[in-house]
Each structure stands twice: as structure tokens, then as C-alpha cells.
Amino acid sequence: MAGIGRLSTKGSVLLLCDMQEKFRPTIFQFTNVVSNAARLLQACRILNIPQILTEQYPKGLGPTVPELGAEGLKPHTKTSFSMMTESVQSSLKSMGDPQQVILCGIEAQACIACTAYDLLERGMEVHIVADAVSSRSQTDRLFALSRLRQSGVFLNTTEGVLLQLVQDAKHPNFKEIQKLLAHPSPDTGLLAFFSSL
């Protein structure tokens, strides 16, 4: 499974990392990144893929932004950069230890990177949704994505992930997913990244 990185609805989980109020004015393309993450969350709900939400020190950084649409998800609070806290690990265990992780949120060079490294060290397959991940600095964001790719992470886009998950226009949920793709994902400034690919 770790060979080519083909996503499946079975054995996958969506990790939503730290999309909180205090980050709103400082994160590059925050609104568009959250919009893409919200689409991923909606799709995973439709496809019955479990979701885990974290908040970094919410007392200081505030709650998850409402436009993510994460009502009903109880956030796992943390101070570590990695999402892989004891409570998150316990949740993953209760979900049957999914082996494919769809990862989005902020910041790319900090919590996203540390989470991805922890997951990779556990032998899990990590799919980072590049247009649903950002940082305060575009430089940090792009270098983090490049570095994570070197470590074996699969990079994709929101639309790419959703289409991989359904795989066929005959999928029973395809029309619902198609509605989420009616408008192209907003630009999050990733074109510069492709000069290094």
C-alpha cells in the first residue's frame, strides 16, 4: 500500500490540525486553506471516513474557526507540535488503527511536519493535502512540503484526494462529492512549488 499511495475509503482517517482563530490574520492564504479543508471534512463525512481534530493551546490561540464546519468533532487539545498525543493515538486505536492518513491544517513546518514524521515512523502512509496546508511564511510552507516529500509523504490537492477516494462515477456517493467539486479549489499560491518538482 505504501508503494504508490493509492487512497482508499477503507482504512483511512482525516486529521485536521489546529485551524484556530488566532492564526486567522497571520497564516498565508488562511481563508482558502480552511475552505479546502472544509471540503475535505464534508467529503469524509459523506464517505464515512473518520476524522480527528486538534487544537494547539486553545486558551491562547482560540477555538477552531467556525467555517471549517467541524461542529460535532471534539477537539483534542495539545501543546506538542505533533498531533500524535495519547488521546489521538487512543482515538486511532478505537478506529481500528487506520493505515492511511489524510493530513491538513497548519503550520506546515511545525505541527504538520512533526505529525507526518511521527506517522511515518509508525509505518503509516501519509497524504498531505497541499492546498489545505499553510504557514505564516510561504517560504516555510514550500520548503516544508519539499522536505516532507523527501521523507516519503504523498502530496496531493483537495480535488485529487476526493476523486481518488471515489475512483468511479458509479460510486454511490459520487454525485454528492461532485457537488463539492462544482467550483475549482481556490488558489493558495502553490504554483511556485512546481518549479522545484
Curated annotation (Swiss-Prot):
PANTHER family per the UniProt record, alphabetical: HYDROLASE, ISOCHORISMATASE DOMAIN-CONTAINING PROTEIN 2
Organism: Danio rerio (Zebrafish)
InterPro entries xref list: Isochorismatase-like_dom, Isochorismatase-like_sf, Isochorismatase_domain
Name of protein: Isochorismatase domain-containing protein 2
GO annotation, cellular component aspect: cytoplasm
Signal peptide limits: none
Sequence similarity: Belongs to the isochorismatase family.
Pfam families recorded: Isochorismatase
